[in-house]
Amino acid sequence: MDARLLEILVCPICKGPLHYDRGAQELVCHADKLAYPIRDGIPVMLVDEARQTVEGTPVDPAGPAQGR
């Protein structure tokens, strides 16, 4: 995932930060408890494509999307 792209992406619902889950290939919004898939290296930032996350679900320890 391109670090420059990750720096500008935000949750389409709340405009909050996203966290990159490398293992699941998803961008996660903790505020809305949604995970947006990354397909072929392209984030799919459509609410209809997002899945609900379970509170407390760990995100890749590599950290938040910013700076990646």
Curated annotation (Swiss-Prot):
A single Gene Ontology CC term: cytosol
Name under which the protein is recorded: UPF0434 protein BURPS668_0926
NCBIfam families: LSD1 (TIGR01053)
Alphabetized InterPro entries for the sequence: Trm112-like
Gene3D superfamilies (alphabetical): 2.20.25.10
Domain of life: Bacteria
Pfam families: Trm112p
Signal peptide feature range: none
Membership in a protein family: Belongs to the UPF0434 family.
